[in-house]
C-alpha cells in the first residue's frame, strides 16, 4: 500500500473515530441529563413531603398553645403564692 493510500485510510478512520466519539459523548450527555432530571424530580417530591410534615407539626403545636398558656398561668400563680408566703413568713 502506498503512503498516500495509508494517509487516506488513516484520515477516514480518524474521522470515523471522531464521529463515534461525538455520538458516544451525546449519548452519555443525554443519559446524564436524564439522571439529573430524575434526581431533581425526586428532590422536589421529597421536599414537598418534608413541607407537608413540617406543616403538620406546626399545626399540632398550635393545637397545644391554649393548654400551654393555661399551664403557664397556673405555674405563675403557684410561684406568686410561694413568693407571698415567703414574704409573709416570720
From Swiss-Prot:
Keywords annotated in UniProt: Cell cycle, Cell division, Centromere, Chromosome, Chromosome partition, Cytoplasm, Cytoskeleton, Kinetochore, Microtubule, Mitosis, Nucleus
Keyword Protein biosynthesis: no
Residue ranges that the Swiss-Prot or TrEMBL entry lists as coiled coil: none
Keyword Cell division (UniProt): yes
Subcellular location as annotated: Nucleus; Cytoplasm, Cytoskeleton, Spindle; Chromosome, Centromere, Kinetochore; Cytoplasm, Cytoskeleton
GO biological process: attachment of spindle microtubules to kinetochore; cell division; mitotic sister chromatid biorientation; protein transport along microtubule to mitotic spindle pole body; spindle attachment to meiosis I kinetochore
Superkingdom to which the source organism belongs: Eukaryota
One Gene Ontology cellular component: nucleus
Subunit relationships: Component of the DASH complex consisting of ask1, dad1, dad2, dad3, dad4, dam1, duo1, dad5, spc19 and spc34, with a stoichiometry of one copy of each subunit per complex. Multiple DASH complexes oligomerize to form a ring that encircles spindle microtubules and organizes the rod-like NDC80 complexes of the outer kinetochore. DASH complex oligomerization strengthens microtubule attachments. On cytoplasmic microtubules, DASH complexes appear to form patches instead of rings. Interacts with sim4.
Function: Component of the DASH complex that connects microtubules with kinetochores and couples microtubule depolymerisation to chromosome movement; it is involved in retrieving kinetochores to the spindle poles before their re-orientation on the spindle in early mitosis and allows microtubule depolymerization to pull chromosomes apart and resist detachment during anaphase.
Similarity annotation: Belongs to the DASH complex DAD1 family.
Name under which the protein is recorded: DASH complex subunit dad1
Organism of origin: Schizosaccharomyces pombe (strain 972 / ATCC 24843)
This protein's encoding gene: dad1
Amino acid at each position: 500500500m502506498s503512503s498516500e493510500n495509508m494517509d487516506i485510510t488513516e484520515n477516514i478512520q480518524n474521522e470515523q473515530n471522531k464521529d463515534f466519539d461525538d455520538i458516544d459523548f451525546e449519548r452519555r450527555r443525554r443519559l446524564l441529563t436524564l439522571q439529573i432530571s430524575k434526581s431533581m424530580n425526586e428532590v422536589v417530591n421529597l421536599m414537598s413531603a418534608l413541607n407537608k410534615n413540617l406543616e403538620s407539626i406546626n399545626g399540632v403545636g398550635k393545637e397545644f398553645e391554649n393548654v400551654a398558656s393555661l399551664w403557664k398561668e397556673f405555674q405563675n400563680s403557684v410561684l406568686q403564692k410561694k413568693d407571698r408566703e415567703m414574704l409573709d413568713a416570720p
